[in-house]
Amino acid sequence: KVYGRCELAAAMKRLGLDNYRGYSLGNWVCAAKFESNFNTHATNRNTDGSTDYGILQINSRWWCNDGRTPGSRNLCNIPCSALLSSDITASVNCAKKIVSDGNGMNAWVAWRNRCKGTDVHAWIRGCRL
């Protein structure tokens, strides 16, 4: 599923991401835009053999199990396929674990490069939330 900007913002808010660990909703919407272009089915293979999955491009080396990543830790205790669902609950729950891990949203390269230090409120402007 490809989410609309405000549709995604509303879903993320409902699932408790607004100001989770101090990151406003705009940060999460911005991250999703530049990680997956709001597409829940996005997958990208990394040079180390791991794969990033879903709307927030969660990595199989650490966070989920895809059965093909050597030494996978599966810290979110989920199959990576769960991160490709049109229902973003699994992605959000795992993202909460990731952002609590010490590096905050710096764990997402696209957030660090495209969202950090910008006017992220623009990503939810005009949305009925």
Swiss-Prot record:
Molecular functions (GO terms): lysozyme activity
Active site: 35, 52
Keywords recorded for this protein, A-Z: Antimicrobial, Bacteriolytic enzyme, Disulfide bond, Glycosidase, Hydrolase, Secreted
C-type lysozyme domain sequence ranges: 1-129
Protein name: Lysozyme C
Catalytic reactions of this protein: Hydrolysis of (1->4)-beta-linkages between N-acetylmuramic acid and N-acetyl-D-glucosamine residues in a peptidoglycan and between N-acetyl-D-glucosamine residues in chitodextrins
Family affiliation: Belongs to the glycosyl hydrolase 22 family.
Disulfide bridge map: 6-127, 30-115, 64-80, 76-94
Ion transport found in the keyword field: no
GO biological processes: defense response to Gram-negative bacterium; defense response to Gram-positive bacterium; killing of cells of another organism
Localisation: Secreted
Other notes: Lysozyme C is capable of both hydrolysis and transglycosylation; it also shows a slight esterase activity. It acts rapidly on both peptide-substituted and unsubstituted peptidoglycan, and slowly on chitin oligosaccharides.
Subunit structure: Monomer.
Function, in words: Lysozymes have primarily a bacteriolytic function; those in tissues and body fluids are associated with the monocyte-macrophage system and enhance the activity of immunoagents.
Enzyme Commission number(s) of this protein: 3.2.1.17
CDD domains noted in UniProt: LYZ_C
Domain of life per record: Eukaryota
Keyword NADP listed: no
GO cellular component: extracellular region
